[in-house]
């Protein structure tokens, strides 16, 4: 956190304009128990690197910057996340079971929990928009749409609810038609 803010100060002193502060995947905890998979997916602030995330976000906003977080949502919400108990309950999983909440855009309960219990609280802390990253392949069957395409649509529409014509997401290319939503 200190070094990130120091970097922003260096840019400002050098006269280099920065409008968006981007936090790649190390913003969240990546060192998770191996039984839950890799650390690519995560939603719990890494307090070793960012001990006071709200203060960081407030400082960046005070400098006139917008803030985006990089997310790789494919692994869903695992028991290692602070949001896990609430999300598990919301989708009908007993949190004591430690069963991961699978990423499933065909499940309305998951979609509601994903936005309302995971993303919106981070937005309330000061996240302005999301950098959606998906490297886990296309749909699970030929009849389904690429998950990244669906994810982009859902995130963009969610942003429109709050930000109207200021809605924005960043994403990889998700195939034909995907240019409608991300940059």
Please give the residue ranges for each predicted region.
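Catalytic-domain carbohydrate-binding cleft regions of carbohydrate-active enzymes
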Residues: 1-183
């Amino acid at each position: 956190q200190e070094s990130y803010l120091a970097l922003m100060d260096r840019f400002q002193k050098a006269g280099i304009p920065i409008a968006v502060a981007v936090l790649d995947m190390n913003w969240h905890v990546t060192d998770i128990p191996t039984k839950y998979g890799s650390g690519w997916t995560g939603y719990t602030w890494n307090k070793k690197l960012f001990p006071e995330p709200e203060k960081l976000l407030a400082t960046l906003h005070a400098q006139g910057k917008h803030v985006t977080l990089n997310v790789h949502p494919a692994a869903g919400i695992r028991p290692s996340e602070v949001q896990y108990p609430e999300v598990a309950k919301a989708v009908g999983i007993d949190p004591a079971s430690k069963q991961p909440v699978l990423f499933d855009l065909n499940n309305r309960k998951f979609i509601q929990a994903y936005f309302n219990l995971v993303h919106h609280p981070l937005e309330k802390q000061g996240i302005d928009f999301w950098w959606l990253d998906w490297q886990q392949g296309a749909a699970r069957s030929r009849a389904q749409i690429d998950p990244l395409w669906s994810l982009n649509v859902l995130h963009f529409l969610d942003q429109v609810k709050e930000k109207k014509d200021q809605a924005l997401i960043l994403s990889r290319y998700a195939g034909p038609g995907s240019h409608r939503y991300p940059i």
